[in-house]
């Protein structure tokens, strides 16, 4: 099911109520339900609201994409928190690479941050490094930087947050038995803020959903904010190309904003033609 949830329409409530419905009305084992969102704070708050609503502990998994995928890698490769590259390790690695390649810059921290951002974008987009053109340095130089950064992580048995996605996808592609085990564990998948999903996150979700296709996604294509990290709201726009039988529901009442704000926002966003056409009304 695809739920188009406008601003202030109760996205979190929809997710928690749907989860409650699966357990109480459909008899689904709570341990087979996976709820994913984009920030740790959001996942924690959603879990708190759900547990309060249930008035008892339920073993539903609430987490971010990275937390869920890292848990999968922990089982497969015996990773621990020590295997996650710390920021200071990543920055020191980049300083050494920059010095080795004799790269020039105005501000070291900004330059390193920008390079790491580009490396992250390449990983999250799933594009070949040979097809990426850097904004910070010549293409051949960037490829050297990218390769040396990867080698540093590999030699030290470290992964960064983007590797959590890349390695999980590779694991599922290479080990059908492991994929089947996780498909059996998480038979029902609910995703909040789906408009901010990126290509590799979505590829993994499709593999997890498998033939059961028990996906319940909630989002608003008008509110995508993570394009700089590879988010692709067009994935949501074309969701029904992958799941043509999915039902679409529109939550069209904004309970947060007054009428003139809702009307003005609707007029502005209406100029964007690459979106779901929808009209949002104010509650009052």
Q: What are these model-derived regions, one by one?
A:
Residues 107, 124-127, 212-213, 268-278:
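Proline-centered turn/helix-capping motifs that create local helix->coil transitions or kinks
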Residues 1-4, 34, 42, 61, ...:
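Conserved helicase NTPase motor core
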Residues 78, 223-281:
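Conserved coupling/interface region of RecA-like P-loop/ASCE motor cores
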Residues 1-80, 180, 234, 263-266:
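P-loop NTPase Walker
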Residues 50, 96-100, 264-272:
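Conserved AAA+ ATPase "sensor/coupling" helix adjacent to the nucleotide-binding pocket
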Residues 8, 39, 64, 94, ...:
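Residue-level signature of catalytic and energy-coupling elements of molecular machines
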Residues 57-59, 77-163, 186, 254:
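ATP-hydrolysis module of ASCE/P-loop NTPase motor domains
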Residues 40-43, 62, 66, 87-91, ...:
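Amphipathic alpha-helical transducer elements in NTP-driven molecular machines
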């Amino acid at each position: 099911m695809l739920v188009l949830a406008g601003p202030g329409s109760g996205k979190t409530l929809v997710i928690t109520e749907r989860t409650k419905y699966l357990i109480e009305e459909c008899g689904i084992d709570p341990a087979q339900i996976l709820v994913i969102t984009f920030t740790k704070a959001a996942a924690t708050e959603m879990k708190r609201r759900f547990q309060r609503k249930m008035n008892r502990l339920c073993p539903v998994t609430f987490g971010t994409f990275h937390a869920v995928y890292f848990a999968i890698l922990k089982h497969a490769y015996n990773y621990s928190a020590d295997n996650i590259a710390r920021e200071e390790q990543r920055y020191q690695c980049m300083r050494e690479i920059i010095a080795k390649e004799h790269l020039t810059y105005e501000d070291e921290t900004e330059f390193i941050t920008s390079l790491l951002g580009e490396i992250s974008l390449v990983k999250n987009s799933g594009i070949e490094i040979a097809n990426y053109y850097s904004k910070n340095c010549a293409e051949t130089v960037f490829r050297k930087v990218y390769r040396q950064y990867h080698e540093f992580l590999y030699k030290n048995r470290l992964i960064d947050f983007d590797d959590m996605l890349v390695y999980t996808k590779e694991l599922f592609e290479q080990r059908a038995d492991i994929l089947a085990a996780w498909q059996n564990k998480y038979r029902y998948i609910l995703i909040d803020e789906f408009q901010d999903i990126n290509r590799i996150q979505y590829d993994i979700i499709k593999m997890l959903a498998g033939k059961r296709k028990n996906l319940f996604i909630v989002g608003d294509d008008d509110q995508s904010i993570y394009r700089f990290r590879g988010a692709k709201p067009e994935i949501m726009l074309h969701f029904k190309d992958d799941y043509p039988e999915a039902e679409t529901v529109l939550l069209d009442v904004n309970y947060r904003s007054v009428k003139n704000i809702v009307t003005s926002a609707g007029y502005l966003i209406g100029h964007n033609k690459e979106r779901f056409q929808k009209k949002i009304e104010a509650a009052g």
